Regions:
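DNA replication initiation modules
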Residues: 74-146
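Residue-level recognition of strand-loop junctions within catalytic nucleotide-signaling folds
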Residues: 74, 159-162
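Conserved small/polar residues in nucleotide/adenosyl-binding loops
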Residues: 168-171
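Signature for HUH/AEP ssDNA processing cores
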Residues: 1-65, 72-77, 81
Length: 171
C-alpha cells in the first residue's frame, strides 16, 4: 500500500504537458533512426541532439553511450504524445534545468570543462544552436561583468578619477 502511494506520487510529478524537455536514453535502447523519427512531428519547434559516447564515470571507466535530446515545442505538448513518438516511458523525459541555452551548452559540455568536450559539429539540430547558445552565454558574461563593476564601485576601487583607466584598458 505504501509503495503504491510512493509510486503514484512519482507519477504525479511528471508534467502533463511540456514546452521544453530533455530526453536522455542509452544508445542500446534508442537508435539514431528512432531519434530522427521521434523528432519528425509538427508540434516540435526546435530540437538539438547529440550522442555522448566519450563520457567517463568518476572512476575513469567509460559510460554507456547515450543520447541527449533537447526539444522546444510550438505549444504545450502532452507527455503521452512524446512517449509514443520516441517509444519511451515518461521517466525518460526531464525538465531542462535553467534555460534552453544552458541545455544547448551542456550538449557539447561547453559549461562543464571537466568533462569531454564534444564538437559543435556532432550536434544535429533544426536551428542555429551555436548562435543561440553563444548569445545566451555572452549575455550572461555581460551580466557578470556589470555585477563585478558595481561591486568595484561600491567598494571604492572604481572612482570618478580612475574609471577610464580601470574600465577602458586593453587586455
Amino acid at each position: 500500500m505504501e509503495n503504491e502511494k510512493t509510486e503514484k506520487k512519482k507519477k504525479d510529478r511528471t508534467p502533463k504537458t511540456w514546452k521544453t524537455c530533455e530526453i536522455i536514453q542509452q544508445l542500446e535502447y534508442m537508435s539514431a533512426e528512432d531519434v530522427e523519427s521521434g523528432l519528425d512531428h509538427n508540434a516540435i519547434k526546435n530540437y538539438a541532439y547529440i550522442l555522448h559516447d566519450k563520457d567517463v564515470n568518476d572512476d575513469g571507466s567509460p559510460k554507456a553511450a547515450h543520447w541527449h535530446i533537447y526539444i522546444r515545442f510550438k505549444d504545450s505538448t502532452p507527455t503521452d504524445s512524446i512517449c509514443k513518438w520516441f517509444g519511451i516511458t515518461s521517466n525518460y523525459i526531464g525538465r531542462i534545468q535553467g534555460r534552453f541555452a544552458d541545455a544547448l551548452a551542456y550538449a557539447t559540455h561547453k559549461n562543464v570543462s571537466s568533462k569531454y568536450q564534444y564538437l559543435d559539429e556532432e550536434v544535429k539540430s533544426n536551428f542555429d544552436f551555436v548562435k543561440e547558445r553563444d548569445t545566451a552565454r555572452s549575455r550572461e558574461a555581460d551580466k557578470q561583468r556589470k555585477a563585478e563593476i558595481a561591486d568595484l564601485i561600491i567598494n571604492g576601487v572604481i572612482r570618478e578619477y580612475n574609471y577610464t583607466c580601470l574600465l577602458y584598458t586593453s587586455p
